[in-house]
Amino acid sequence: MYFNSNGEKVSRARWKEMYNAFKNRQELVKAGLTSRRDLMKMGLLTGAGMLIAKKGLSTRAWADTWGGGSCRTGTSGCGNCASPTTRPWMMNMPIPTVKQPIALSALTGPAPTIAPNNAINPATGIAYEGRTRAHQSPIGSNGNLPFPAATVYQVNQQVANVSMSPDLPMQRLWTFDGMSPGPTYMSHYGTPILIRNYNNLPADNGGFGINSVSTHLHNGHTPSESDGFPCDYFASGQYYDQYYPNQLAGFLSTHTATNGDINESLSTLWYHDHKEGFTSQNVYKGLVGHYILFNQYDTGDETTGFRLPSFPNYDIPMMFADRCFDATTGDLVFDTFNTDGILGDKFLVNGVIQPVLHVSPRRYRLRWVNTGPSRFLQIYITDLANPTASNPFYQISNDGNLLPKPVQVPAVALGVAERSDVIIDFSQYAGKTIYLENRLNQPNGQGGPTGSVVGGGQGFLMLKIVVDQPTAVDNSVDPATLPSYYTLPSVSASPRVTRTFDFNQDRNGQWTINGKLFSCNTARFTVQQNSLEQWNLSNGWNWSHPIHVHMEEHQIIKGAPGLYGSSSDDSSNYSRWGSEYCWSGCSTSTASGVNLSRKDTVRLVPRASANIKMRFRDWQGRYVMHCHNVIHEDHSMMLRFDVATTGDTNSNP
């Protein structure tokens, strides 16, 4: 069965035409013509963004993009891919190594400095460091946050050949230290770290991606100059010293006596490239990794604190992604002309297609991250011996934050960049094989409204879990006893200002916020430091947008996302997208269950709205809000806001 980019059935001949158009676009990509400016200069692109039928290029090359919906199967949505056949369960799931600190004297290059090191490196002819702003106070000021940090790392962004499947050739990826995902940073609250991030990426991108980068610590309470602002990119041959304070929010403002609010503790973060205009390509090419924070309660040791399963043996980070591969060569491909959203027909866990994980019959903490680029997930545990049976488990976090208490769930829904920590007791599956299955049928990159949840065993099996390892002592607390974690910080105070944001698309196909495009140089509004604001987010079209705000977390006041339902493909029936969502003409609902939490990304499904409240404490500088369907982000669904001593009251920026 074949579909076009609108989810409509088409003939095999029509699908082949779409595929050939994609191949034409790839020829342009390989020739280095990856920007609209290049194509307009050559007369191949109109000002409205349409490809012109010229030199054999199909007029459908733009309209029927690879991220459309041309599925050749009836499973959980394969996009417009035609990747080579790969055998599942041929490789063990990689667990990225934990990054080890080094001595300050072991850093390559000059010693770290508070101000950017703009001295010219004679070997490259450009500045040693790509940073353009100084580390802000209190870093290095009166010793409050020591500089350089006592814990220092050096990581190299470099090209490497990586195996994703024995049935595909080695893939030439952008990596951190030769790995994708990159190494895992295991950090602790109260211990600042400095990471010297070296850019050693080559000029030859192999068809897509760019070798100037900006690394963002997603969900970090990070000073602006180290946040990975999309326009703070640095070139190949330079380094960038990023300082992560690892301090609780409020440590300089609302909770100085306790060195921050313990209820603002973070746990599961991740890092990824954030280069303006190229985030999707560089992330797709491999620039992602895990960052984990522990404290005196979430300790990484199941005999202390909250007694969650011990890291790293029983606490395992997992990154989910989907990718397309060339049907002939087996090489990773990316459609740079796609502005809607790219879906792959191969599902990866920690960089490998459909791997295997062997576990012991005991409780594990699994940290799930959806890295996209555009696919929404709804993950179930499936036993193929009884695929329709419910296999509930416990969700203990939403994004990077522990819930007040564990919540038993049948599944977890994840938009791009959303995270969930879950606890699964594998003792109930001793000697068995089970699977993590994505049952959300997403036929195209827009993320809805034609998606629905398929039955057990009819979706896409992403990970095979074999419970065959020796029995191990389990000192972790049973989540069924509903232990308490953190208390939600109060957001009952009146906001200093309420701002409204509409996420939409202009007539040229560019994604917008309040009808405006992203600018590196212009802040749309200024937030007053240490204030509370309410932001009302709305999505009036048939698209889904996972909206991420940098710098601090929010709480969803109204319009919280629920699990996707199993409704039919009636596009007027939006109930499938979760009973907690508000649609046009309905009254919004308050958050409950797993959404009664702190978050940094909120899913706006078609015609939905959500109201969030958040504080902006401790740091100043420039930050962004954007759609984390990174295709939308790269095509301007992003805005810059600044945090300063004095803020404005612009309600519709």
Task: Go through each PLM region and give its residues.
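Extracytoplasmic beta-sandwich strand-turn segments characteristic of Greek-key/jelly-roll folds
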Residues: 180, 185, 213, 217-264, ...
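Extended terminal and domain-junction accessory segments
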Residues: 64-152, 280-321, 388, 398-546, ...
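Short, cationic motifs built from Arg/Lys/His that form the positively charged side of catalytic pockets
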Residues: 36-37, 367-370, 499
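Non-catalytic, beta-strand-enriched accessory regions in extracellular/secretory proteins
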Residues: 171-173, 177-184, 344, 349-356, ...
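Histidine- and aromatic-rich segments of cupredoxin/plastocyanin-like copper-binding domains
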Residues: 219-248, 320, 324-481
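A long-range scaffold signal marking pre-active-site subdomains of enzyme folds
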Residues: 56, 62-227, 231-237, 241-268, ...
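N-terminal twin-arginine translocation
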Residues: 28-41, 47-79
